[in-house]
Amino acid sequence: LSGSRKRDYWGPGMNKLSKTKDAWRRALEPDRYNILFEEGTERAGSSPLNDEKRDGTFICAACNNPLFDSSGKFDSGTGWPSFFRPLAEDHIETKRDFKLILPRTEYHCARCGGHQGHVFNDGPAPTGLRYCNNGLAVRFVPRDEDLPPLID
């Protein structure tokens, strides 16, 4: 990020939000809330962001925290927007998910805790990682537009 796009997002540590689930439920559309705060998953192939090819930034749909740059996006063939690296390591957090037979690693927005998706070790170089994101969990901001302010 450069210029005004960078100003409000980088600093010493991530300011975590402490909103309740009820507050998020009132602030978000039901489908977004389900994915972000009930750890739901959207149907594969349902997100228009799969076909998003413009330069820009993918931000958390709950709090506007910048999570991914378009330069790290790739077509994984899975039906979900996929990235091989986050915009900044401290903008996401991971935890083990035991909902299926085999454990997986899920990742969340480090600021609001909103569930984004799962990370796998089958991505392209240079990281070998695939951040498989729910499209409803992020919003795309084209490079020529200012990023929206962070939501408190």
Q: Residue spans of the language-model regions?
A:
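Short, Lys/Arg-enriched N-terminal segments with co-localized hydrophobic residues
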Residues: 1-13
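A short Gly-Trp-Pro
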Residues: 15-152
